[in-house]
Regions:
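Alpha-helical transmembrane segments of multipass membrane proteins
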Residues: 19-27, 56-64, 104, 121, ...
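Juxtamembrane helix-loop-helix connectors linking adjacent transmembrane helices
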Residues: 2-11, 15-17, 28-100, 113, ...
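Transmembrane helix-loop-helix hairpins at the membrane interface
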Residues: 82-197
Length: 197
């Protein structure tokens, strides 16, 4: 199914990731003090970062599975019709989630956060998600609530970056997006009209 003009395409997501990586490398090279890129590889040992990110992903996936398989909980999930039109077939949730995790964490956490701080970085991160908020709901209240949640996620990911490291922030961010998109795909499949046999 071709994407509508309002829904993000896979190509657009990958290009955005590449743009964010290029901006992160440029901003770090131009604006960070020497030695450059130290924030990119500092933090806790990689094994600890991988373990914590993996545990987070397992807990998140378990929670999503419970919600999707308990009818009383699943009925509480409300997905706007505009989000139901996003093509999430095949490996798209994985590609989009990994691209967002890598590109956004390199730009917003590794590059910008050391320059502007945790809170301003989280606000910039939320502002970068304004288009997604517009896809989600026509209501200004719901859009604002979504952006506040994204800002809170930006603070949480910023703390992960500061206390654990970039690898953990990338993997936690990617797991949120991948699991969220796969859950959206599941909800969309259940909501799709059944074809007559």
């Amino acid at each position: 199914m071709p994407p509508s003009p309002r829904t993000p395409s896979l190509k657009g997501q990958v290009l955005t990731c590449l743009l964010f990586v290029a901006l992160a490398v440029s901003a770090t090279a131009l604006l960070h003090p020497s030695p450059k890129f130290t924030q990119w590889h500092s933090g806790q040992p990689i094994s600890l970062q991988l373990s914590i990110a993996g545990a987070f992903a397992v807990l998140l996936a378990t929670g999503a599975a419970i919600v999707l398989h308990v009818p009383a909980l699943c009925r509480l999930v409300r997905v706007p019709a505009t989000l139901m039109t996003i093509d999430l077939s095949g490996t798209r949730p994985w590609i989009v989630g990994l691209c967002a995790g890598i590109g956004e964490e390199l730009l917003f956490r590794a590059s910008l956060q050391p320059l502007v701080g945790l809170w301003v970085g989280a606000i910039i991160f939320a502002a970068a998600h304004a288009r997604t908020a517009m896809l989600g709901s026509p209501s200004i209240v719901k859009r604002s609530a979504y952006l506040l949640n994204v800002a809170a996620a930006g603070v949480a990911l910023g703390l992960v970056f500061e206390h654990l490291g970039l690898v953990a922030a990338i993997l936690i961010h990617a797991s949120i997006d991948v699991i969220g998109l796969m859950a959206l795909r599941s909800v969309a499949a259940r909501s799709a009209p059944k074809s007559a046999a």
